[in-house]
Amino acid sequence: MAAVLEVEIGGEAVREAAGEEMDLSELAPEERWRVEHARMHAKHRGHEAMHAEMVLILIATLVVAQLLLVQWKQRHQRSYNMVTLFQMWIVPVYFTVKLHWWRFLGIWIVFSIITAYITYKATRKPLLQTTPRLVYKWFLLLYKMSYATGIVGYIAVMFTLFGLNLLFRIKPEDAMDFGISLLFYGLYYGVLGRDFAELCADYMASTIGFYSASGMPTKHLSDSVCAVCGQQIFVDVNEEGIIENTYRLSCNHVFHEFCIRGWCIVGKKQTCPYCKEKVDLKRMFSNPWERPHVMYGQLLDWLRYLVAWQPVIIGLVQGINYCLGLE
């Protein structure tokens, strides 16, 4: 059956019969999209029942996959976290190369090189005394940069939606692309940085000996020693430090500011590194403007599922549809 497409381009009707091919390279991007959109509608005309089956397959696969992921995380959390981290790191690269997003690929390579070096330093035995602070400072810097980038991207998107970009004579599509790109950079590297920080935090703390993931501490903690980095504490809790302050948790253990902030926020640790007591973040962070980035960290946890597992689930659904002859 011969299908005919009619697309208005430049005031003239372009008719394409089913055995004829149009040279889309000569058309403008908007006109090319309109032709491809019309072709898609002509191809799928009369497939309503088939599309309903595909929607049911998608919903069923999402539900089953979610249940399996929850059970996997509850029963074998360590393997789940490692696989999720690997997918978070690798999956976007496939789409980057496929779509020729070379800027993202360049940033990803720089991030991977630095993070690989930091992770290498964190997994060495014996652990150097300067390594924990180096690790935490890098991931704190990465966390703050990703947080700021995400906020700027969100503001750019909101400005575009309210039409404020016209005040600066910026096209809406350019402003929206800029905002969404910054928002993606901030969220992606925020999630990836937190996962690598948790991996390094667990390994370093267990290497130092004060913290054990499943047992009692293997060393005695002195009142003047930080349980995260193992170095001496010179600033009293009530004193104002020149470089950093000293924090006392609700369990009365004291830590360097950078160490405990990295432990609680960057590494998603909500317990004391020494006694595993629940940490009161509201009491720890006295400044009101310092509390929102804890909720921001919870947002990143939700996005981890979308970036790491959603492409896998969609690929599985497409495989099922292909085997059943659905399109």
Curated annotation (Swiss-Prot):
Give, as in the UniProt entry, the pathway in which the protein acts.
Protein modification; protein ubiquitination
Query: What domain of life is recorded for the organism?
Result: Eukaryota
Query: Which EC class heads this enzyme's classification?
Result: transferase
| Gene Ontology biological-process annotations | ERAD pathway; protein ubiquitination
Its EC number(s): 2.3.2.27
The GO cellular component terms are: endoplasmic reticulum membrane; Golgi membrane
The protein's location, in the record's own words, is: Endoplasmic reticulum membrane
Enumerate the GO terms in the molecular function aspect. Answer: ubiquitin protein ligase activity; zinc ion binding
Presence of the UniProt keyword Endoplasmic reticulum in the record: yes
- Family annotation (InterPro entries): RNF121/RNF175 (IPR040176), Znf_RING (IPR001841), Znf_RING/FYVE/PHD (IPR013083)
What this protein catalyses is: S-ubiquitinyl-[E2 ubiquitin-conjugating enzyme]-L-cysteine + [acceptor protein]-L-lysine = [E2 ubiquitin-conjugating enzyme]-L-cysteine + N(6)-ubiquitinyl-[acceptor protein]-L-lysine
As for membrane topology, the entry says: Multi-pass membrane protein
Transmembrane regions: 50-70, 79-96, 99-119, 148-168, 173-193
Keywords linked to the UniProt accession? Endoplasmic reticulum, Membrane, Metal-binding, Transferase, Transmembrane, Transmembrane helix, Zinc, Zinc-finger
ZnF endpoints (RING-type): 226-276
Question: So what does this one do?
Answer: E3 ubiquitin ligase which accepts ubiquitin and transfers it to substrates thereby promoting their degradation by the endoplasmic reticulum-associated degradation (ERAD) pathway which is a pathway involved in ubiquitin-dependent degradation of misfolded endoplasmic reticulum proteins. May regulate the unfolded protein response to reduce endoplasmic reticulum stress.
Member of which family? Belongs to the RNF121 family.
Indicate what this protein is called per its UniProt record: E3 ubiquitin ligase Rnf121
Which organism is the protein's source?
Xenopus laevis (African clawed frog)
Protein's gene: rnf121
